Amino acid sequence: MALSQFVPFSATELLLASAIFCLVFWVLRGSRPRVPKGLKSPPEPWGWPLLGHVLTLGKNPHLALSRMSQLYGDVLQIRIGSTPVLVLSGLDTIRQALVRQGDDFKGRPDLYSFTFITDGQSMSFSPDSGPVWAARRRLAQNALNTFSIASDPASSSSCYLEEHVSKEAEALISRLQELMAGPGHFDPYNQVVVSVANVIGAMCFGQHFPESSDEMLSLVKNSHEFVESASSGNPVDFFPILRYLPNPALQRFKAFNQRFRRFLQKTVQEHYQDFDKNSVQDITGALFKHSKKGPRASGNLIPQEKIVNLVNDIFGAEFDTIATAISWSLMYLVTKPEIQRKIQKELDAVIGRGRRPRLSDRPQLPYLEAFILETFRHSSFVPFTIPHSTTRDTTLNGFYIPRECCVFINQWQVNHDPQLWGDPSEFRPERFLTAEGTTINKPLSEKIMLFGLGKRRCIGEVLGKWEVFLFLAILLQQLEFSVPPGVKVDLTPIYGLTMKHARCEHFQARLRFSFQ
């Protein structure tokens, strides 16, 4: 029987297909950088032609890449489409790259989705990493510290953050009581995110922030439209054809960024109308003081039109990260009531019921602090940092890494590494306490990865940790959280730039006592 009866293609078609395959193979092979003598490329698992490893990553890239690291080591390479991506796991390897070789790994890849964040001018997402970027980052850091964790001489509170959080936590307690008197239940994230946004809004804009306006509420309650497309491994960043196909998630992402930028731009412009450089009251005012009109900056001055970009980064990152942390904390507390009771016992013993918690109480509340650390570790709700890229040819752990290589930092793997934690799947706050149980095991706490490391480390890390602590301390002093019997709480993370839990609308809060 003739071979042609089994083959549905002509000889010409087979030759043409073979030629195309060889051409694609040659192009992909030729696109790989030459490795200097004596070095080697990172190990790379087998991937599909043209697709690379995108199918392997699936819906939970942090889990897939953690499994790969067990087989191939802390430095491995994958391909998304034809783009090589370096994946780093393991605390020591990540510290080597981001801290000891920080200048080599401080870049950002020029990804398509990043161009829609503050029109591609984001301090956090843009590829810039030179002297101008560094100066603006320092300016933003100083402004943030001055009007958050620095002391406030005009207030009885220890700092601006304590003043704003105390006010918003009290308002949140009142709002939750109203919901319990009405519907009798609530969604914790929807309530917490408004309070957190009001705090960062007050620090950014002072009295100019449109607190709880319809526009602001719409933005903060729909932040998932941002995080679902800004996550590491978004196919639209690696397969250009997807940009021209129907993509509802991408359209929501674009629309959200436009609305968010317009909202902040309007608020910044209104603030500037009565700005007084001799009476700076908030972060935006501090940025105005170090700005100049015109498109170019000189020295430590920045163009006024760029201020909204810095405010966008500060406001956007802080409200989403902190609200997500507090919401995850409440989810753990209702599933583990014994931990909630232990925290409240500590609060009653240290603070009592005659005053509200303050930031200065933090060292005396080690179990609450240990619970927060374990929430950060166990949820790992920031599974990857924003992707990095290499600024020059370099080596890491004996592997050659070319310039402009996209780099994924797997924070989830570090937080669930059995070599670090022993029983990473267990939720156990006690792991962060010293043997006496009275202080935090600081060396162990510093192994948690949530805010990145090195030159791209989150500038709001200290603010975020303080704010989560104070919100939880005030809420748990007065309220006991629960869900009705029979209601299942789903703690499965939903992948994104920040991983949310499934919404739970059946939360309840009981007032433990009232302040007179």
Curated annotation (Swiss-Prot):
Tell me how this protein sits in the membrane. Peripheral membrane protein
Q: Which GO terms describe its biological process?
A: arachidonate metabolic process; cholesterol metabolic process; estrogen metabolic process; hormone biosynthetic process; progesterone metabolic process; retinol metabolic process
Tell me the organism. Macaca fuscata fuscata
Q: Which domain of life is it from?
A: Eukaryota
EC numbers for this chain: 1.14.14.1, 4.2.1.152
> Which residues hold substrate?
226
From which residue to which does the signal peptide run?
none
**What cofactors does the UniProt entry give for this protein?**
heme
- What does the subunit comment say? Interacts with PGRMC1; the interaction requires PGRMC1 homodimerization.
Give the matching PANTHER family: CYTOCHROME P450 1A, STEROID 17-ALPHA-HYDROXYLASE/17,20 LYASE
Where do the annotations place heme binding? 458
Recorded protein name is Cytochrome P450 1A2
Q: Which residues are glycosylated?
A: 69
Compartment annotation: Endoplasmic reticulum membrane; Microsome membrane
Q: What does this protein do?
A: A cytochrome P450 monooxygenase involved in the metabolism of various endogenous substrates, including fatty acids, steroid hormones and vitamins. Mechanistically, uses molecular oxygen inserting one oxygen atom into a substrate, and reducing the second into a water molecule, with two electrons provided by NADPH via cytochrome P450 reductase (NADPH--hemoprotein reductase). Catalyzes the hydroxylation of carbon-hydrogen bonds. Exhibits high catalytic activity for the formation of hydroxyestrogens from estrone (E1) and 17beta-estradiol (E2), namely 2-hydroxy E1 and E2.
